[in-house]
Amino acid sequence: MTHLFEGVGVALTTPFTNNKVNLEALKAHVNFLLENNAQAIIVNGTTAESPTLTTDEKELILKTVIDLVDKRVPVIAGTGTNDTEKSIQASIQAKALGADAIMLITTYYNKTNQRGLVKHFEAIADAVKLPVVLYNVPSRTNMTIEPETVEILSQHPSIVALKDATNDFEYLEEVKKRIDTNSFALYSGNDDNVVEYYQRGGKGVISVIANVIPKEFQALYDAQQSGLDIQDQFKPIGILLSALSVDINPIPIKALTSYLGFGNYELRLPLITLEDTDTKVLREAYNIFKAGENE
């Protein structure tokens, strides 16, 4: 079975200028990603600062990306919230706008149990009838989708993948035992673990760093699929990832997207920009990475 995508899906940032969504910068960024081998684009997720976007802004961003991409790669809309009915309505609207799939985070704050998660995800999948990527990110939600729950959900015809941001390979192996990896894709949600994640059968990554190095990050996946040892190829990327870890995503990555010309270096509160010294160090790390490519 063909998966939704294989390789690098980009968790797209939202460019702002004077606190307004900058559509021209958004288009330029998406064109850059398409020209540099991104395999999917994920819109209105964590990296997009989605909690600070209005419903109208989310729909405008999604429509803009869908129209520009024009079916060249899948556009996946982040529509999950901790309110099932709101998630259903957002998912229905995403489908109406032309999204190829939706991504659903676990519930948060008003946390449920595993049975509640099953009901929540199945209700949305039943209502919208688009491919669904589950999103497990315990560090942000303080709950997980247990392997047994993934097994149940993987039986739903519309639930086709998991974005696994647990950074826990024991979890990955438990999930793998319980699913059909031919029909259900496992994507890493952690850029720094992709070498081992790919070795363990992951079909790709939903990536933050690919906002600025999509071609290089996709080349890593392609090399692994060709049977090459990618440890050395990953090392310079790993150094840049270490520089990106200076603060919470998406604060650092937007210091780089803005450096490439995709909007100002702006975030919406409660997120704030890096200190100037940290911004300078991060951008220099990016310059060193790019210079190393040309040696």
Swiss-Prot record:
Residues reported in the UniProt entry to bind pyruvate: T47, I206
Enzyme class: lyase
Superkingdom of origin: Bacteria
Subunit structure: Homodimer.
A GO cellular component annotation in the UniProt record: cytosol
EC number: 4.3.3.7
NCBIfam families: dapA
Signal peptide range: none
Recorded coiled-coil stretches: none
Biological or metabolic pathway of the protein: Amino-acid biosynthesis; L-lysine biosynthesis via DAP pathway; (S)-tetrahydrodipicolinate from L-aspartate: step 3/4
Site (Part of a proton relay during catalysis): T46, Y109
Keywords, ordered alphabetically: Amino-acid biosynthesis, Cytoplasm, Diaminopimelate biosynthesis, Lyase, Lysine biosynthesis, Schiff base
Annotated source species: Staphylococcus aureus (strain bovine RF122 / ET3-1)
GN (gene name): dapA
Residues at the catalytic site: Y135 (proton donor/acceptor), K163 (schiff-base intermediate with substrate)
Protein name: 4-hydroxy-tetrahydrodipicolinate synthase
The family this protein is said to belong to: Belongs to the DapA family.
Function: Catalyzes the condensation of (S)-aspartate-beta-semialdehyde [(S)-ASA] and pyruvate to 4-hydroxy-tetrahydrodipicolinate (HTPA).
Protein location: Cytoplasm
Catalytic reactions of this protein: L-aspartate 4-semialdehyde + pyruvate = (2S,4S)-4-hydroxy-2,3,4,5-tetrahydrodipicolinate + H2O + H(+)
Pfam families: DHDPS
Primary residence: cytoplasm
Listed GO biological process terms: diaminopimelate biosynthetic process; lysine biosynthetic process via diaminopimelate
GO molecular function annotations of the record: 4-hydroxy-tetrahydrodipicolinate synthase activity
